[in-house]
Amino acid sequence: MNDPDTESVDTPLVDARAISVHFESQVILHEINLTIPRGQTLAIIGESGCGKTVLMKTLVGLIRPDNGQVMFDDRNLFRMNPLELAKTRKRFGFVFQNAALFDSMDIFDNVAFPIRQHEVADEDEIRARVMQNLAEVGLPSEVASKRPSELSGGMRKRVGLARALILHPELVVYDEPTTGLDPIMSDVINELILATRRRYPVTSVVVTHDMRTARKVANRVIMLYPRRRLEPGQSQMLFDGSPTGLDNAEDRRVRQFVRGEAGERLDELTRERQSLNS
């Protein structure tokens, strides 16, 4: 990791500039501009089909935009050669919606997989790091010998988080981290996301439809609309009440919604938006 003493927390780790993505003739993202300062957690919310997951994958170099550029630590992800990109992706951690664990491996080998792919370490070191990460996400040591199919959905999510953090990444991306979980387990995952941020200076992107998660873990929230241009500062709500680029009526509704004063479902906000446009 880079030395935090030499870098300002206000320096963007990720800087997306006018990125657009098309699939065939369909516009998925249109001129998206956003920055993610070091150490902050950004939540991306929006209705189904608005491009949340596409935006997330573009920010980490998994989808190449048709226009625009994504800067990571002041370097253009899409101008890196394959070796440079591979080294940069080591600095990312991914927590997938379905945990994406390898069924052919036990939990120990699932969590150890990134170490064996990217580092040279002896088995004693690997074991110590894996067991420490499992403990940090609240899993007992006996889980290490189990297969993913033997675990509950919440336990698999925690294994996915342990694996994502095993290399101490600078950027962690969470794709719908609480989908399919009951409220109690959702709160556990949210607390683990916060605990990760407290343990070391990590920057995070959380794609979610869960307003409780957005309120709990994020410093900043982006409301993404289908095929709408997003300028710096626009559709971004700071929970301290800072102004946004939304018009006043819509701004109030979005703020209320994110704070939980207008309900917990995105379709409620969608109905509000439709009434504003009618």
What is each model feature region?
Residues 75-76, 123-142:
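Conserved ABC ATPase "signature" region
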Residues 147-151, 155:
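Conserved ABC ATPase signature
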Residues 168:
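Conserved catalytic motifs of ABC-family nucleotide-binding domains
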